[in-house]
């Protein structure tokens, strides 16, 4: 059951695409148009410090997330009550679906995911209406 939750959470948090395609730095402005926003809130497992989690989050973003086609940008925040909010901007929904399969088996994602309390996770996918840069 925990493995299923882990896979689902990995999929939800890391909606991205095949790493063999363009990354954000190579995308034109047209390709960087946000077509989907992923918002995930969660708490960390007991004993995981914010500092430690931030290191895993940065490593996962650098080594995995930023290399995915369709990834535009990410914001990770933490509130006073230790609720984390991960906001990821994607090119389109197709990239999100493609990453579901990829994130299930990525060894680059697992260390990040193991730090998250699965029972606290809430995730939504939304189509943006207004995005101001």
Regions found by a protein language model. Give the residues of each.
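An amphipathic, aromatic/His-enriched active-site/gating alpha helix that lines ligand/cofactor pockets
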Residues: 66-72, 89-124
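Short, glycine- and small/hydrophobic-rich beta-strand elements in well-ordered beta-sheets
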Residues: 61-85
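C-terminal motif of bacterial Sec signal peptides marking the signal peptidase cleavage site
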Residues: 15-16
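A beta-strand edge to alpha-helix "cap/lid" segment located at domain peripheries
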Residues: 54-58, 97-98, 133
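Short, surface-exposed ligand-recognition loops at beta-strand->loop->(often short) alpha-helix junctions
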Residues: 43-55
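Active-site-flanking beta-strand signature of metal-NTP-handling nucleotidyl enzymes
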Residues: 35-43, 85
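Sec-dependent signal peptide recognition
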Residues: 2-8
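Low-complexity, Pro/Thr/Ser/Glu-rich flexible segments characteristic
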Residues: 19-29
